[in-house]
Amino acid sequence: VTGNQNKVAEAHGILSPLGFVIEQLLIGGQVPDLIEPQAEGIEEVAKSKLDQAVSLTMGTEFENEALLVEDSGLFIDSLSGFPGPYSSFVHETIGLSGVLSLMSGETDRGAEFRAVAAVSFQGNILSSTGICRGVISENISGDFGFGFDPIFIPDEANGRTCAQLSSHEKSTISHRGFALKGVSELLNPPSK
């Protein structure tokens, strides 16, 4: 459940080959407007979004469908985990250049993306966490991806930012990819 087409495409690319059908939830032709709580952790944000989505689908054709939500954040070591669960707000307000300004002169550029994917299915809630370690780059670089991808260099990316990776390369090492694959294993996907 998201209005972010990039997240829908990424989930589709990761879960469809595993036998899952991924569709963006539309109620009355509209993406549900979920309130993003300001919480201390991405787990709480994902659970809140999932609870809202389940409530919105009660009494609709989607009431018995599996619902997937994902929340993620960028956690920068030298900034005590900032922006963390406030990543969307920080991206919208100070953007990539603002984060790079906060990191100006900083030698400890370690960071990680964390994601939580949560599914409501047949009355059960299943969740999985994914982490991708790396560093914050010195400059904005790359044309692919979204969010903080142009300033995050995963450890496994040979010096390239997430925004310089193909969608396939990114999905094999990304926090979201790990979280989504973890949920798929919990769901025991249908046979192909």
PLM regions and their residue ranges:
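Anionic-ligand binding patches
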Residues: 5-191
